């Protein structure tokens, strides 16, 4: 099974954790106004926090990673990472941090990391509101929880409504 097939299979799960900037689900009338305010004032900081979490996980665990498709017409430098199926988990940490900032700022493409000895946990950065951890064991969750708390973010379990 190639890396894209494994990622697709893991993404079919509806049991996962996600990283959020809010401690609880916000149902207030002004949520979208708050979200716009939060990211217009904190996007750089948020990108740095997510980068710190990912890079620390890559320091702890073996991993493989890929970028996903780019929109039609995108011709920037990062497109070759997808076109050539480059293992982004093996790039230097500064470059990985730049990629995370790119994905979270532009909100297109995504980064998918298979983490662990058997590469059975998926850390998926899809956009600002979709940073998911799928098929993580208790050891992974314990570490991720500590890293997320250290960065002032929240690890929440997805509950289907």
Regions found by a protein language model. Give the residues of each.
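Structured alpha/beta or helical-core interaction and ligand-binding surfaces enriched in interleaved
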Residues: 1-130, 134-161
């Amino acid at each position: 099974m190639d890396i894209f097939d494994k990622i697709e299979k893991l993404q079919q799960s509806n049991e996962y954790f996600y990283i959020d900037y809010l401690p609880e689900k916000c149902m207030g009338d002004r949520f979208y106004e708050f979200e716009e305010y939060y990211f217009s004032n904190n996007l750089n900081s948020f990108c740095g926090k997510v980068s710190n979490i990912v890079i620390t996980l890559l320091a702890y665990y073996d991993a493989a990673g890929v970028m996903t498709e780019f929109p039609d017409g995108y011709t920037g430098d990062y497109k070759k990472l997808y076109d050539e199926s480059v293992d982004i988990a093996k790039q230097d940490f500064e470059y990985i941090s730049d990629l995370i900032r790119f994905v979270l700022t532009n909100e297109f493409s995504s980064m998918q990391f298979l983490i662990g000895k058997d590469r059975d946990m998926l850390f998926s950065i899809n956009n600002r509101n979709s940073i998911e951890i799928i098929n993580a064991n208790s050891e992974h969750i314990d570490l991720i929880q500590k890293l997320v708390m250290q960065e002032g973010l929240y690890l929440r379990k997805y509950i289907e409504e």
